[in-house]
Amino acid sequence: MRKQKKKRLAAKGWKVGSIKDFLGLSDEESAYIELKIRLASGLRRRRQEKGLSQLDLAAKLQSSQSRVAKMEAGDPSVSLDLLIRSLISLGASERELSQIIRNPRAA
């Protein structure tokens, strides 16, 4: 959030902080969640770039559309392993995976 927006919200009595602070997450928990969100976003972006529906991707992964939806939403039941394997099945290289992890908008 931009500084001006934070100031404006604080001036109106809103408490401005991070999700990490709000949820009381440790640094490790916060990093894990951020990694999962980046991979999930990367999966959605790559699927859309390939012109696939969630159902198409589910068939490719021998899974269900609802499972793909959970993967793209970063659902807690989805493992990092499954997200990475799914990205690889869509043709993501090691370099592209590292770009997704470093910068979610890069890949």
Language-model segments: residues:
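Alpha-helical DNA-recognition elements
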Residues: K70, G74, R85
